């Protein structure tokens, strides 16, 4: 599996672990540092839904991502080194538009908001 990850991700660091099942979209746009741990049933995505040519999702060295995390980049999300997230954390640089109340949210465009950068050593608690 490690060889598959090294070939599929933009970068996949040494001693990193991903626990399955996991949903991943846009692997070629995702960089995972050394000694990263991604727990059960997390969702990683780096896809150009808002028009960005090469969206970026970076997870820094020594970071641990908890169970059921959802990390979605349409332009740029960078998670620093030695970051710890609890379970059920949502991190995204985009949101669902709700500009026309006569149209269901699911039928409206994805809206790009600011890039996200989580600093080194950050702790993000559960259900954030």
Predicted regions and their residues:
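Extended, small-residue-rich solenoid/repeat segments and analogous flexible loops
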Residues: 1-25, 29
């Amino acid at each position: 599996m490690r060889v598959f990850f090294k070939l599929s991700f933009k970068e996949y660091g040494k001693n990193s672990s991903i626990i399955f099942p996991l949903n991943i979209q846009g692997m070629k746009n995702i960089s995972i540092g050394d000694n990263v741990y991604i727990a059960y049933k997390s969702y990683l995505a780096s896809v150009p839904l808002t028009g960005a040519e090469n969206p970026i999702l970076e997870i820094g060295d020594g970071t641990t991502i908890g169970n059921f995390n959802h990390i979605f980049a349409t332009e740029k999300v960078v998670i620093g080194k030695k970051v710890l997230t609890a379970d059920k954390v949502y991190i995204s640089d985009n949101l669902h538009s709700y500009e026309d109340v006569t149209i269901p949210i699911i039928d409206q465009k994805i809206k790009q908001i600011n890039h996200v950068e989580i600093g080194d050593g950050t702790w993000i608690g559960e259900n954030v």
